[in-house]
Each structure stands twice: as structure tokens, then as C-alpha cells.
Amino acid sequence: MAKDLKFSEDARRAMLRGVDTLADAVKVTLGPKGRNVVLDKKFGSPLITNDGVTIAKEIELEDAFENMGAQLVSEVASKTNDVAGDGTTTATVLAQAMIREGLKNVTSGANPVGIRRGIEKAVELAVQELKGISQPIESKEAISQIAAVSSGDEEVGQLIAEAMERVGNDGVITIEESKGFNTELEVVEGMQFDRGYASPYMVTDQDKMEAVLEDPYILITDKKIGNIQEVLPVLEQVVQQGKPLLMIAEDVEGEALATLVVNKLRGTFNAVAVKAPGFGDRRKAMLEDIAVLTGAEVITEDLGLDLKSASIDQLGRASKVVVTKENTTVVEGSGDPEAISSRVAQIRAQAEESTSDFDKEKLQERLAKLAGGVAVIKVGAATETELKERKLRIEDALNSTRAGVEEGMVPGGGTALVNIHRQVSELTLEGDEATGASIVLRALEEPVRQIVHNAGLEGSIIVERLKGEKVGIGYNAATDEWVNMVEAGIVDPTKVTRSALQNAASVAAMFLTTEAVVADKPEENGGAGGGMPDMGGMGGMGGMM
């Protein structure tokens, strides 16, 4: 296929048009008075959002050269979202500022490679300074503030802070759509897995259709149980103790299941059978997790263990087990705390080493089930459009909070970037490298300018005053006041601010060193789009009648 080429100034200008188109659409959402963007969807109602990365991913431009520029900035937003989960609009604003400022200098004869080195050195110093003014997040109130700033909603901030307090920083917090209007928090204590009872006759509470076992023994095996004789010896030992039994096996069927149900209905013995969660290797790992949590031993032929010779010592215990049609929850398993914490450390190490996002997510879920529990934030709204928008905001807030817990927080509202302006300006560089550093200095002011601009005021006045204020004092665009940002609860996670700056600088440096751009030539759509050749002369077919 034939290609179109553009060189030097032409190439960069064409790509800059794309950068500006995308960034201008994204940056209107920045700050407490930022607006929303409406995205057309082929099916269903349009999506209304203020999430930078969601907007950036939707934008594709007709001109191939402009589209390349737009996609470069879109990558800044995506990368920041992958690393920190929020700050995508800030990253886009920073990238646009660095690219525009850098392009002016390259056009007037500066060397792009020197500029690139200057940008990299200035950003490295800026990141160090950000870490220097960062404060750790320890209180529930600080967590609530970060989530509230990200979502623009104090109620969401409190919900996320409560969820993290209940399930711990390692806990799984999922976001689901609610059937009602209200947004609420639901916490599942203990370990829950998605397998229910093998037979509805096993329920103990007919109204709720659930089986509740108080202080039960727990048998864990990876075998199918079809013959009751296999488990009879261990069943007799449990009956003597007068306690209920939870059986977790690959499957319980046929005569074994029938015997358990009959004994339950007669009131002789209370046992609930549940299929093992997961599949393949993940199933083995999950059974091992349950065993560690309850102090049981997984009875598996891999270890040379047999059900017939199993004893009551190999069973686990828990204070309570609740089994519904779809889920089983084990509360307060009586496993050894040291064994549990070493298992948690092992899973955490696996998660850090894993390169697959899917595996990471599954390991994180297992970690949460062992370490604390699972919290579900059910998002409610009046319409589907509002629900989608609210759900996106809460997801951003949750990511932002996690990033904050990891690396601490800095004054929000773009203040931290201006706070480090003086230290970065003291960096002594020569020639084009000094030009690169000045590009970063100008970009550090841009998020504040944009937040103020979105609030309907002049950014330059605020930025100049902010440079003279001491660290932490900033402009609250929501109330039009100068406040101590941390005390006012306007904070950003250090990780989010740092990632936004690093990713923006990376793409800007690449952009400025671009000297040629190659794109596919647009196809000429001629007439009937390559149909069949002239079909004249077929009129004579009448003679075939």
C-alpha cells in the first residue's frame, strides 16, 4: 500500500493539531468546576463522563497525521491510568503544555535531543521534590479526602474510606450497579467463594433459603464423592462430636448426596456439601487457601492421602459457615495466624511477579479473602446515563485512594506541581538542556491554570501568587479561597501526580525528536467501489425463454 510522508516542521505541526484536538476535549473536565463530555454510543444511551482516559480512548481523527498526535497523548492518559488509576486529565494537560512549548523552541532552532535531555533531568528532580513534600496517609479521614477530591463527592469519599477500614488496604473492593437510587456499601466478612449447596434440601433457614452451620467441622478434598462408604469413617467421628459438617469436594453426587440429604431431613446429622471453587490449578490453590484459613488439610491423592483413612484431626474449623444457592462464606476460620500470614506473603509475592493482569486480579482476590474480606459498593442513580457516569467516578476515586495509601499524598488542585517550581528552576543546565528544563517549568503551572480557567477566572494571576506562597497553601477553585490544601481536604495521591508528570514528559520528549512521519495514503473511493465489469449485452437473454 502506498504511503504518505511528512518531514520536520510539517510533520510536527500536523501531529500537534491532533494533540490539541484531543487535549482540548479532555481538559475541560479538570478541577471542581470542570464540565462533562458526552460520548456517542452506537447502542444505548450516550455516555457522559469527566474521566480523561475514557474520553481519550474514544477519539479517532480522520487525518492520519493528526490522529497519530492524538493517539500519542491518548497513550499518556492510558499509561497513567494503568499505573495510578487516576490523574489522566492532568497527564494530558501536562503533555500538551510540554509539546506546545517544546515545539516553539524546536521551530526557532533548538536541538530536540538537547531539549529531551533537559526535560528528563528536570522531571527527575521534580519527582524527587514531590516525594519530599509527600505525606503518608494513615487516618480514615485522609482516605476519605482523597476519594472525595477524585470523585467530587464527599459521600463517595466516606463510603470508600469505610470500605477500606472494614476490609483493610489489601481487601477487595468491587463496584457494582445497584437496583435502587442510593449508593451503599455491603461488606462480606470472612472468606466467600462462588459455590452454593449441592442440594436445596440442605438449607436450615427456609425463609432465606440458606444453610447456616454454627461451629462446624470442614472437610476439604479435590476428589469426587459418589459412595458414602468413602467418607463414612470421618462422618462417624464428626457425629460423635455432635457438630455439623461442611464438605468441600470436586463433586458430591449419587448415593453419597442422597445419604447426606436423608440424614439431614431425619435430623440425625447436619451436613452441607459444596463443590470446590475455581478450575484446574487455581482450584488447588483456592482449596489450599481455605485449608490454611480453617486449619484443615486438603485430602488429595497428590499427597498420598485417602478419604477412607481421614481422621477428624485433618478437618478444619470455623465459628460459622453460611451457604446460599450461589455462595459459601466461611467466617472466623480457626487456622494458625502465622500460617495464614505466611500464605498471604506468598500470594502477594506471586502477584508482584505476575505479568498477566488477569492472574494479578485473581491473586489479589485470593489475598483479600485471606487477609480481610470483600466490600461491594453498590452504585445507585435515577437514570442509566447518570449511573454509568457515577460508576466511572467511583472507580477513579477508588484507584486514586489505593495509589494514595501506597505512596502518600501531596497538596491537591495542581498546587504541589507549582510548590516544587522554585527547586526545579534552580537546576543548573547549559544551552538546549536549560531550554528543556524551562519547558517543564512552564508545564508545571498548566494544571493550576486549567483548573482556574475552568472555574471562569484568569490563571496567570493565581499562578504568580501561588509561586510566592509557602508549600501547602493553594487556591480552592470550588470556593474561590486561598487555603491550606491539606487541612481543607484537597489532596492528590503522590503516585498519581508523579505518574502524570513522568508519562507526559516521556511522550513529549518522543514527540519533539520526531523528524519524519509515515502514514497510509487514503484510499480513493471510485464510483461503484470495484464492482463487476460492464454487464452490457445481456439483453439477448430474452431468447432463452
Swiss-Prot record:
GO terms for molecular function: ATP binding; ATP-dependent protein folding chaperone; isomerase activity; unfolded protein binding. GO terms for biological process: protein refolding. Its EC number is 5.6.1.7. InterPro entries: Cpn60/GroEL (IPR001844), Cpn60/GroEL/TCP-1 (IPR002423), GroEL-like_apical_dom_sf (IPR027409), GROEL-like_equatorial_sf (IPR027413), TCP-1-like_intermed_sf (IPR027410). It is found in: Cytoplasm. It holds the Pfam family Cpn60_TCP1. This is Chaperonin GroEL. The gene is groEL.
